[in-house]
Amino acid sequence: MPAKAASAAASKKNSAPKSAVSKKVAKKGAPAAAAKPTKVVKVTKRKAYTRPQFRRPHTYRRPATVKPSSNVSAIKNKWDAFRIIRYPLTTDKAMKKIEENNTLTFIVDSRANKTEIKKAIRKLYQVKTVKVNTLIRPDGLKKAYIRLSASYDALDTANKMGLV
């Protein structure tokens, strides 16, 4: 402890004459030397984190720029009537529906809805449909029962398709 006190006293003695010398120079010399700019360092107070987990603060994220694709070609619509209607069913139950209920039975794409199925049948076989019933079979395929209007015969349409 006494060593620290002695060094502090020595530094006070040394600093006093320097300040006195600098005051004399400032009085005699140019006033520009006295008005020397001092460098100011600003210290911002940091927030103390009181939570046990550190959460990174949000920083600026530049919005993404859309890059033009190098392969600029016309996108082809792969969802057409031939993709929607896969194939007709020729089981005994399907044949009975053709004869008694004027209904055709098809396996269709599992993502197709009833209106798309109706439009595809109209395009492929040129017949009007009254309604479309669909079900998903246990094997994952979608079956569609297409009831034709009274002006069209399901048996004639099946003959044109080559079912009967």
Swiss-Prot record:
PROSITE patterns according to UniProt: RIBOSOMAL_L23 (PS00050)
Coiled-coil regions listed: none
GO cellular component terms, A-Z: ribonucleoprotein complex; ribosome
GO MF: rRNA binding; structural constituent of ribosome
Region (Disordered), start-end ranges: 1-41
Keywords (A to Z) from UniProt: Ribonucleoprotein, Ribosomal protein, RNA-binding, rRNA-binding
InterPro entries: Nucleotide-bd_a/b_plait_sf, Ribosomal_uL23, Ribosomal_uL23-like, Ribosomal_uL23/eL15/eS24_sf, Ribosomal_uL23_CS
Key word rRNA-binding present: yes
Disulphide connectivity of cysteines: none
GO biological process: one example: translation
UniProt record similarity statement: Belongs to the universal ribosomal protein uL23 family.
Protein task: This protein binds to a specific region on the 26S rRNA.
Protein name: Large ribosomal subunit protein uL23
Organism: Trypanosoma brucei brucei
Gene: RPL23A
